[in-house]
């Protein structure tokens, strides 16, 4: 959908600052941008994004939109989508990933260049741990699963072509 309150807040902040400082995008809006538009920072593109998002909401379920997002989001090192990220970072199929590895990939989403385990493993692990904590608090995993994932050593795949320089 479209988060009217978030968009309004972003609009006010952007007008006050004189430049694009906030976006206020929902997952559906990010899918619209990822698949149909570009990252240009202008109001015309934002209006198109909102219209496409409304159409997507009418045509697809939330799960289908989430699937589109997860299969198209850039996760660093040349990986688009979680399937490619599983291969790039761990040399595995997504079905072979551990909870710890899934949490690490999830942590890349906000900023793949900042949270890249190839560039800053400590920061990537810190983000992974924060995600595992949230998953435990929200009841998605047990204390045992959280602790097991927290104690798992990160074993990155250095065999694939590491395109991390693209993220600079």
For each of these PLM feature ranges, what is it?
Residues 19-168:
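Non-catalytic, structured segments within soluble enzyme domains
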Residues 1-13, 19, 137-138, 146:
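Conserved catalytic or metal-liganding residues and their short signature motifs at active sites
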């Amino acid at each position: 959908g479209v988060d009217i309150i978030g968009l309004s807040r972003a609009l006010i902040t952007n007008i006050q600052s004189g430049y694009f400082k906030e976006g206020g995008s929902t997952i559906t809006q990010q899918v619209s941008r990822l698949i149909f538009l570009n990252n240009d920072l202008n109001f015309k593109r934002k209006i198109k994004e909102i219209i496409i998002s409304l159409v997507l909401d009418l045509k697809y379920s939330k799960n289908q939109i989430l699937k589109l997002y997860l299969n198209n989001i850039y996760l660093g090192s040349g990986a688009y989508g979680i399937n490619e990220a599983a291969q790039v970072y761990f040399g595995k199929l997504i079905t072979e990933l551990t909870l710890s590895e899934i949490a690490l990939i999830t942590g890349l989403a906000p900023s793949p260049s900042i949270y890249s385990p190839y560039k800053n493993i400590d920061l990537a692990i810190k983000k992974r741990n924060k995600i595992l904590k949230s998953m435990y608090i929200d009841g998605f995993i047990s204390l045992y699963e959280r602790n097991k994932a927290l104690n798992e050593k990160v074993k990155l795949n250095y065999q694939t072509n590491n395109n991390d320089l693209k993220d600079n």
